[in-house]
Structure formats: structure tokens, C-alpha cells
């Protein structure tokens, strides 16, 4: 991949990511201005819970399939990826079932006392019940990327991921059924898991049938490759969401709503990093498999320059206009200004 090609593709992905951020903030602004802060806080608690749980249930398969894609492309055997995907889907499904069984053994009183909230047990239960659909959606999104459908992958990750719940939330508001917000959020992933599963299945049908010399990886080999990636993913989700989980035990859901908006604004600074990574990850795996480390170093250096050039202006704008930005979500959300500045400084 040339530097110009990297820049052009990164800009396309960045545009989709930027559009996704705009959509996310429009949705968040709608919630914070038309739903109670308590309900928004419950929604953010459920969203954070399912993100952390999915880091475990995915066990790195969504990242590992990118590696296998690059490896198989370098061996001219991409059609072998179908069997890998099916095994990954079986692995993640088994883990989701284990979560359900494990949580069923925990006393309701214990969970409620742990989080100091009467609704904590039911909110987590709903998250676990929808975990399979959320996990499958995330795996399918990266499978699309592994199958050279980067734009489709980013459309799901950044646009379609928020569109159903945005529409549902508007319907719930105008029908005076706001209390169903969390159920609508979780149900949106049932819809997304089905649509992505259909698209992935259609793409697999277009691949050539496996040949006798194609690569076949066992469950153990896939797990050995994916679990180190799971550790980094879990660490990322914990860093992104554990503060909201911990805050739940000490503050009301209203405070969680205020703080969560600050977190969303702070994550905008990582937009360039994520956009470039989306583009270069399959290429890194492909180049690494050929042992062309000079080419690999050049790709990484070019990527780092692009990330720096895009990130710094965004960081400065957020620092200068933090109060104004928070005010868009409602008057009370300005209370999170200090938290936002601390997050940006970190």
C-alpha cells in the first residue's frame, strides 16, 4: 500500500468514522434533552456492561480474523477463512451461554448490594441476555473487513450500529414509552446480528470452494492466536467503561449520565488512531507474513504521521470549547466540564 493509497483510504474511513461520531452525538443529544438523566444513566450503564462482557465473549476473535485474513491472502488461500469464522462463532456462542449460566447462579441481592442499586441485577441480566447478539455483530463487522469490505464494515460500525436505536428512541419518545429505551437498545443488536450474518454468508458464497491444500486451523490453534488479542481488547474496554461501572456503586444514575457525555467527547481524540488502524491492520498482517520488515516499518511510520496531524487540532478544539460542547447536551451536563478536561489531559 503506497502512502497516497493509505491516505486516501484512511480519509474515507475517517469520513465514515466522523459521520458515525456525528450520528452518535446527535443521538446522545436527543437522549439528554428529551429523556431523564436517570434513564440516560441506566442506558450508559448497560452499554458499558455489555461492552466489557463482549471483550471476554469475543476472546479476540474479531481481531484474530483480521490476522488470518492477511495470512491467507499472502498464501492465496482466502477461501479457508470460512471454516475459521464458523469455529470462532461456535466459540463465542459457547462463552455467551457460560455467562448466562454463571450469572444465573449469583443471588440478586448480592448484585444489587454490590452496585448499591435495586435495578443493578435486572440491568446486568438484560445485558447478558443480549450478549450473544452484540458479540455476533462485532465479530461480523470485523469479518466484513477481513473479506475486503472495509467500507461496509465501517458503515455497520459507525452508522448502522446507532441508526436502529436512534429511530427506536424517537418512536418511544413520541409514544410516551421512554421506559423501554434499554430494551430497544439491546433489541437493535438482534437486528444488526441478523443483517450482518446474512451479508457475511453471502460473501462466503462468492468465495471459491476450499481446495485440498487449503489451510485448516483447529479450535486450539484459533484460541491460541486470539486470546492474546482478547487481553488487549479487554484492557481497552475496561479502560473505556470500567469507570462508569465503578461510578454506579457510589453515585446516582444521573451522575453517570453527565460523566458518560464527557467520556464520549474525550474519545473523539482517538478518531484518527482508530481510522488509520482500521485501514492498516489487514495490511500489517499480510506484510508480516512475508517478513518484509522494511516495508512494515515504513507503513507504521507513515500511519503515525497521519494520526498526529489529525489528532492535535481535535484535541485543541475540545480543550477550548469544552463548556460549550457540554452545554449542547443540556444545562446540567456542564457539571462534567472538569471531568472532560481531566480526560483530555490524560
Describe the predicted segments one by one.
Residues 1-6, 113, 174, 178-185, ...:
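Interhelical loop/hinge segments that connect adjacent transmembrane helices in multipass membrane
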Residues 28, 59-74, 146, 262, ...:
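Helix-loop junctions and terminal segments of transmembrane helices
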Residues 43, 47-58, 232, 236, ...:
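Transmembrane helix-bundle signature of multi-pass secondary active exporters and lipid flippases
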Residues 121, 125, 155-205:
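Hydrophobic alpha-helical transmembrane segments
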Residues 107-127, 253, 294, 301, ...:
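Interfacial segments at transmembrane-helix termini and the short loops linking adjacent helices
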Residues 7, 133-156, 341-345:
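Membrane-interface junctions at transmembrane-helix termini in multi-pass inner-membrane proteins
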Residues 5-66, 100, 104, 227-253:
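Signature of the first transmembrane helix
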Residues 8-21, 46, 59-108, 122, ...:
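Membrane-water interface segments that mark the loop-to-transmembrane alpha-helix transition
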